[in-house]
Amino acid sequence: MRIGYGFDIHAFGSIKPLIIGGVQIPYNKGLIAHSNGDLLIHSLIDALLGATAMGDIGTFFPSEDKKYKNINSRILLKYIWKRIYLKNYRISNIDITIITETPKILSYIFLMRSNIASDLNIKIEKISVKSTSSKMIGCIGRKEGIACQSLVMLVKSKNTDRKNNII
């Protein structure tokens, strides 16, 4: 059993659409980022990489590399998961917390969970996505940005049959 933790935070200020968990959220500001700024996916990638001691998102996708400019972060997630999956790791569960004052995202959580389940080819029941506020404290409380934390538990599979990876 392996546990990984990921964290990401981005400031508002971009004209890009606001994307969280692969879902475009109607809002008047996007997040400043090299990629599409999907901080949920970024924190999840870091959690997966941490659980397997493979480094971090910047190791695989450096912000200096122009080929990752505005890239859909779900593509990056699928790439990382394939590498981890081929090492016979399977996801036991994922627990994600988004910290934001605004926008309110409760109505988008099921879509986020669905996107993650699809990208990782796992059952949606293995994925928890929650939202909380910072109680008006700090940069998030001042509505300057959004943060996200992800926890992942992986198990090593004894089954090398890769035909059915939904566990």
UniProtKB/Swiss-Prot annotation:
* E.C. no: 4.6.1.12
Name its GO BP terms in alphabetical order. isopentenyl diphosphate biosynthetic process, methylerythritol 4-phosphate pathway; terpenoid biosynthetic process
Which residues are involved in binding 4-CDP-2-C-methyl-D-erythritol 2-phosphate? 8-10, 34-35, 56-58, 142
EC top class, in one word? lyase
Sequence positions that bind a divalent metal cation: 8, 10, 42
- Which protein family is named in the record? Belongs to the IspF family.
As recorded in Swiss-Prot or TrEMBL, the protein's gene is named ispF
- What positions are marked as the site Transition state stabilizer? 34, 133
Q: Which domain of life is it from?
A: Bacteria
Keyword list (alphabetical) reads: Isoprene biosynthesis, Lyase, Metal-binding
The reaction(s) annotated as catalysed by this protein in its Swiss-Prot or TrEMBL entry are: 4-CDP-2-C-methyl-D-erythritol 2-phosphate = 2-C-methyl-D-erythritol 2,4-cyclic diphosphate + CMP
Role this protein plays: Involved in the biosynthesis of isopentenyl diphosphate (IPP) and dimethylallyl diphosphate (DMAPP), two major building blocks of isoprenoid compounds. Catalyzes the conversion of 4-diphosphocytidyl-2-C-methyl-D-erythritol 2-phosphate (CDP-ME2P) to 2-C-methyl-D-erythritol 2,4-cyclodiphosphate (ME-CPP) with a corresponding release of cytidine 5-monophosphate (CMP).
Q: Name one GO molecular function term.
A: 2-C-methyl-D-erythritol 2,4-cyclodiphosphate synthase activity
Query: Which CDD domains does the protein's record reference?
Result: MECDP_synthase (cd00554)
- Its name, as the record gives it, is 2-C-methyl-D-erythritol 2,4-cyclodiphosphate synthase
* Subunit organization: Homotrimer.
Cofactor note as given = Binds 1 divalent metal cation per subunit.
So, what pathway does this thing act in?
A: Isoprenoid biosynthesis; isopentenyl diphosphate biosynthesis via DXP pathway; isopentenyl diphosphate from 1-deoxy-D-xylulose 5-phosphate: step 4/6
